[in-house]
Amino acid sequence: MKIFVGGLLYEWKTEMIKEQFEKYGTISSIELIPDRKPGFNKGFGYVEMPNEEEANKAISELNGIELNGKKITVSIATERKK
């Protein structure tokens, strides 16, 4: 299941996201959307978790929590309309 993660600090790295999500199960991939400024992200990204039950638990427990002073949004990723 692909999970959207928003409200991240721009200087966060994938290891920081992994630390939060691996508590809930297996992670297939983590993608932080890069900013034009090297070494920074755009404040959002995606986590892929193959087990739907683990993914749903991560979403319900991580959505709305505060990390490093910022409230994050965690939800099921949806396809963008073209």
Regions found by a protein language model. Give the residues of each.
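Intrinsically disordered, low-complexity RNA-binding regions enriched in Gly/Arg/Ser/Tyr
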Residues: M1-K42, E48-K82
